[in-house]
Regions:
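Phosphate/ATP-binding catalytic cores across multiple sugar-kinase/actin-like superfamilies
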Residues: 1-21, 114-118, 248, 252-256
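Short catalytic/ligand-binding loop motif for oxyanion handling, primarily in non-cytosolic enzymes
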Residues: 30-33, 88, 131-135, 140, ...
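Adenosyl-5′-phosphate
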Residues: 113, 120-122, 173-349
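Short beta-strand segments
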Residues: 22-25, 46-51, 79-81, 124-128, ...
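ATP-dependent adenylation/pyrophosphate-handling site
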Residues: 19-67, 71
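A conserved beta-strand->alpha-helix junction
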Residues: 45-46, 62-97, 105, 118, ...
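Active-site adenylate/phosphate-handling loop in enzymes that bind or generate adenylated species
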Residues: 110-172, 176, 257-277
């Protein structure tokens, strides 16, 4: 059932009267899509990999393994390389295309640009596989945190006091948001917010005008809405899948794919985010411990994926934004990038 559902979704998303390709990394999602697409008999399927000069030859360089996958399935493959100075040159255009602030989409912006330069007008993406097949670290970390701290829930109202006292010490060794462990970590919605947020609610008044932060948080009522997303679902995997799909994938990943693709007049299609696919695999996803994981997805192609792909630990699509935007004395990584994006939209970095 799973193999047929995946194959049908990929086949349906290949239908077009313009050139179509596949974004190919060394991850299970895109390699599975490329393999299934090759099975359809599409004449000389085109695949594209984005490489970063900073990673060339290192553990985060996916180009060689992606090339191995392309050779196995006989695709017309291209690798496009990008450097930090190209990011700097395109930064203004990237932020302009963004429409509204986001910390993601950098990788999609550049791979979409490369695809358009290669003559593609449609590209298939592996977006959605992590949410569907439970492969984010959050699927393990969120239930574990809520389970371990759950007995302390009666003390959660005191979490704000503890957080204020512990914040300077926590900030010295890790992200400041983890000062809120007791305040947020005793429930699944709170643990998810703690795991996924870049900045926690109490930090926003230092980024936005305090009144705006206060009113926005009151209107959003984040924990209540996160809890409402779960409804009466009790299975930990399904709980996290709902949260990741509704809050991270829908609000960030899909929106970022849309603006990043449209910036280059490229349509990005997502075979793993498909209502018919979800209908067909929903009974499998509700099977508890027997629910299919990424390995089951990767077993779908008739011609099996290379062993190096199957054995490769999950790394995500790594972009060297941390190095590209690093500023002396400032926050690094996505928190630093978020402040720069906010400043570009009229805020204060």
């Amino acid at each position: 059932m799973l193999r047929a559902a995946l194959a049908d979704s990929v086949s349906d998303h290949l239908i077009a009267d313009v050139p179509v390709g596949v974004f190919l990394s060394a991850g299970l999602d895109s390699t599975t899509i490329a393999a299934l697409a090759a099975e359809t008999g599409t004449a000389r399927l085109r695949t594209l990999t984005l490489g970063f000069e900073e990673f060339r030859g290192g553990p985060n360089d996916e180009t060689a393994l992606a090339g191995e996958v392309a050779a196995l399935y006989a695709t017309a493959h291209e690798t496009r390389w990008i450097r930090g100075d190209e990011f700097a040159a395109a930064r203004a255009a990237l932020l302009d295309a963004m429409d509204q602030p986001s910390v993601d989409g950098v990788n999609t912006f550049f791979v979409a640009r490369a695809a358009r330069q290669a003559g593609l007008k449609v590209a298939l993406s592996g977006l959605g596989g992590d949410e569907l097949f439970a492969s984010y670290p959050s699927f393990r970390q969120v239930p574990l945190l809520a389970r371990r701290l759950g007995p302390l829930r009666p003390l959660a109202p005191l979490g704000g006091v503890l957080r204020a006292l512990a914040a300077p010490l926590v900030a010295a060794v890790t992200s400041p948001k983890y000062a809120g462990l007791l305040e947020y970590g005793t429930s699944v919605p709170g643990a998810y917010l703690l795991r996924r947020s870049l900045f926690m609610p109490w930090e926003l008044a230092g980024i936005l005008p305090p009144e705006m932060a206060r009113d926005g948080l009151a209107e959003l009522d984040t924990l209540t809405r996160l809890g409402a997303t779960l409804g009466d679902v009790a299975d930990p995997r399904l709980q996290v899948s709902l949260l990741e799909s509704a809050w991270y994938m829908r609000n960030q990943l899909l929106r970022d794919a849309d603006w990043a693709g449209m910036a280059h007049s490229l349509e990005i299609r997502t075979p793993l985010v498909d209502i018919e696919l979800l209908r067909r695999v929903a009974p499998l996803l509700a099977a508890g411990a027997a629910a299919p994981d990424k390995r089951a997805m990767a077993d779908a192609p008739r011609r099996k994926l290379p062993g190096a792909v199957l054995a490769r630990p999950k790394t995500g699509f790594v972009v060297p934004v941390r190095d590209w935007i690093a500023a002396p004395g400032g926050e690094r990584g996505l928190r630093g990038w978020a402040r720069q994006v906010h400043a570009a939209f009229g805020g204060v970095a």
